[in-house]
Amino acid sequence: MKEPSIVVKGARAHNLKNVDIELPKNQLIVMTGLSGSGKSSLAFDTIYAEGQRRYVESLSAYARQFLGQMDKPDVDTIEGLSPAISIDQKTTSKNPRSTVATVTEIYDYIRLLYARIGKPFCPNHGIEIESQTVQQMVDRIMELEERTKIQLLAPVVNHRKGTHEKLLTDISKKGYVRVRVDGEIMDVTQVPELDKNKNHTIEIVVDRLVVKPGIETRLADSIETVLELADGRLVVDIIDGDKLEFSEKHACPICGFSVGELEPRMFSFNSPFGACPTCDGLGQKLTVDLDLVVPDKDKTLNEGAILPWEPTSSDFYPSMLKRVCEVYKINMDKPFKKLTERQRNIILYGSGDKEIEFTFKSKFGQERKRTMPFEGVVPNIERRYHESPSEYVREMMQKYMGEQVCETCHGQRLSREALSVYVAGKNIGEVVEQSIKEALIYYENIELSEQDAQIAHLILKEITSRLAFLNNVGLDYLTLNRSSGTLSGGEAQRIRLATQIGSRLSGVLYVLDEPSIGLHQRDNDRLIHTLQEMRDLGNTLIVVEHDEDTMIAADYLVDIGPGAGEHGGEVVASGTPKQVMRNSKSLTGQYLSGKKFIPVPEHRRPVTDRKISVKGARSNNLKNVDVDFPLSVMNVVTGVSGSGKSSLVNEVLYKSLAKAINKSKVKPNEHDEMTGMDQIDKIIDIDQSPIGRTPRSNPATYTGVFDDIRDVFASTNEAKVRGYQKGRFSFNVKGGRCEACKGDGIIKIEMHFLPDVYVPCEVCHGKRYNRETLEVTYKGKNIADVLEMTVEDATQFFENIPKIKRKLQTLVDVGLGYITLGQPATTLSGGEAQRVKLASELHKRATGRSIYILDEPTTGLHVDDISRLLKVLNRLVENGDTVVIIEHNLDVIKTADNLIDLGPEGGDGGGTILATGTPEEIAAIPESYTGRYLKTVLARDKERMEG
C-alpha cells in the first residue's frame, strides 16, 4: 500500500517555476535553499495557504467574515492536505499585558491552583486568614486547659484616631458595663477623654467565663453577640496568658484586612478584580525621567539644559523659566548640575503655593500679566501627557517619560489581596518571577497536604507538562512574567511550538519558519527532539530551515534553487539527507557533505589598544560586567540563549553610543561608565526591521540609487524639451505619477466576506506613472521599466554610470541581485531588509571610525549566503571600521577576530564574561559551551583543508 503523501502540482507563487513535488505525510520535512530561492513561497504561500483556505472555506459565511479569508495560491492542485497551522516569527503580541505565562496558558492553571488551594495571610500581621463558624470557635476555646479564665471582647475600634465619645455613649446605652481601652479594662462611664490625635483601640467586654464542661451554650450565645457588635471579629483574652483572635469572614481578626472569596479572576492582572489599582495591572507606571528631561547636566539653562523647554517656535515656556529664575535669583548661565538642590527642585517641581507674576506676549506683540504658582517642568509634562487631546503633544511628552516599577505592587501587577494568598509558601507574584526551569523544579517538588494534593493533582499535571515543553525547546531561562513584546522572533516561535505540543493534536500539518533562530547549538538537540515528538503524534511538519543539525535530522529534505529570485524556484534535490548529499547539483548537499565549506581565516586581525571599554554593566541579568570591544576588528558576542548578549550589546553598548554620538533620546541600561567613545563618529544598528512600512518604500528608494536614476531620466533630451525636473519621475508626488492610483499602481477593493482585492490600476496598468512621464526613455526603457528590473539587470543597464553602478553592485555583493528595484519593502524578508541596509552602508565612503552592530545577521541565510555576508563584513573591517555581531552560527563565530563569550547558562545562571579572545582561545576553555562546539568545528575544518 502506497504511503500517504501531499502532492503539489504546478506551484507558481512568486518565483516558483511550475513546481511539482510529492512530500511524505507524518514525516519531518525540511525545506532549504538560498535566501530568496522560493522555500517560503512553496511552504507558506502555497501549501499552508491552501490548507488554511480549505479549512476556512468549510465554515459559514458569517464565521468567515471574522477570520479573513486567504487568497487561493497560484497552484494547479494540491492533494492529501491536512488542516494547516503556521508557526512563524511575525505574530508576536506587543501588548504589555501579554506575558510568557499568559501566552502559554500556564497562568490560567496557576490562577486556578491559587483559587482552589490558596491560603490567604494578613500582610500586616502574617497570620492566616480563615473564615470560621461559631461552632469552630467554640471548639477551639474548649480546647483550652480546664479552669482557664477568659473574657470575650468585641473589637469595635481598631487603632483609629478620635475621641470616640459617641461610640462610648452608645455602648453604655446598650447595657455594657466594661470596655478595654488601649489594653486597659475600665468602666464604660469612667473612660477619660481620649486624645483625638492618637490612635486608640476599644473593645467591649461581653462576657467573662471559666473554661469547663457545660459552658458551650452560653459561650456560643456570647460569641454570636460579639460577632454582631464587631463586624464578625472576636478577641478571646486569656487572663494571665495570650489571646486568641477569630473572624467569621475572610478577614484578619486583628486589623480586619479581608480577602473575598478566592476565585481565578482575583489572580488575573487583566481583570479589575485582580489588577493592582495603581498601575492597572501593568506592573509599571509611565513617569517623567529626569535623565531625559535634563540629558546634559553640564549645560546651563540659557544653553537649553531643560530639553522639553528649549526655545523653539514658541517662547512661552522659556520666558516663564526666565521669570522664575529672576524671582528666585537663579543664575541661568551656571551649569545645571552646579545649581543648589533647592534651585533645581523649584525648576523641576514648581514653586508650590507661592504665586509669581508672569508676563506673556501674544504673537501680535500684545502683553498680558497673570499671577499664579509656577507649575514646574515635571508636573507640566505629566499634565500635558494625561490631559492633552492632541496625539502629537502626548507623543512629544512621552519622549521625556520612562517606565518605572509600580510602588504599590512592586512590579507584580496584582492587588494586595491577591498577593496575600499563598500556596506552599509562595504567592502568585513570586511564582511568576521564577524562570521556566526554576518553576518546573518548584512544581515538580511542591509539598502539599493530602487534601490539597488531591485537589491540585490535575492542575499541577497541566502546569508541569507545559513547563516541561518550554524547557525542552530551550526556553528554560525565560521568566514566566517576561513581557511577550520583549521576546525575539525565535523565542516567540518556540513558545507557540510548545503551546502546540501541549494541545497534543494529531493529523495536523505544521509549517514552521526557522525555529532554531536565536538558539545556541547546545539547545538544538532538544528542539529537534521536540519536532520529532510532534511528528510521532501523527503530524506532518514542514520546516523552512538552514541549520545543519536540523537538516541532517530530517526524514525528508527538499533543496529549492539553484539560485535566488528568478534563478531559483525549482526543486534541485529531494529525498533523505544522504540522498541530497550525493546530488552534485545541490548546493546544500555539497555543504552538508563537506565538499564545500566556509574556511577558517589563515590569519586573524590583531587586537590593538584601540577599544571601547564598558565598566560595571548591570542590564537585566548582567552581573557587574567589565568588557572591552577592540576597534577595527570583527567582534562576535556568543553565549547560550538568555546569557545576556543582547543586554550587553543592544541595551548598553549601542544605546550609550547612540546617545553620545547620534544624540538619540534613548536611555542606556545600567552601567558605571563607558570609555573610548571619542574614537567613534558613527554608530549603525543593522537590524532586521523593515526598510519601510508602506509599499512605496523599496530597495531603490532606501539605498538612494533612485535619486540618481531620476537624475538620469531628467537629463535626457526628451525630459529637457518637456521641461521635466527630477521630481517628475517620483511616484510619491503630484506631477509625474498616475493620479488615479496616487502612484501605487494598484487599487484596493474592499470585499466584506472575502479578503480585500488589489487590482492593477486601469489607468496606468500598474506602471505608477502617467502616460507623459512614461514617454521619456533612457536606452529604450522608461522609469517604470527600470523599477521592474532586477538589481542584476539594472547593474548592467547602468554600467556606464559609475555612481549608479557602484550602489547597485553593493546590492549584488550582499546577494540581492535577484530582487527588483521597485519591490515593495513590505514584501522583503527580515534577512533581505538587513542586507539592503548593509548594502546602503557599503557604498558610503569609509571613515575607519564607524561601528556596525548586527543582531543575528544569519537569520534566513543559507550557508552560501553566509559566506557572501562574511565577505561584505570583512570589507567593512578592512576599511578600518568595527563590527560587533551577536551570533550563534558557528561559521560566523569561527571567522571572528575577537570573541566575547557570555554565560555559563541563561537567565540568572548567566550574565558573566566567561572568556574573550580568538576562537582558538575560546575553544580551549572547557566551561564554555560555545568553546566545546567550536573545538569540534575547528578540528573538522582543519581536516577538510588538509584533505
Locations of the language-model features?
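Conserved phosphate-binding elements of NTP-dependent enzyme cores
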Residues: 1-947
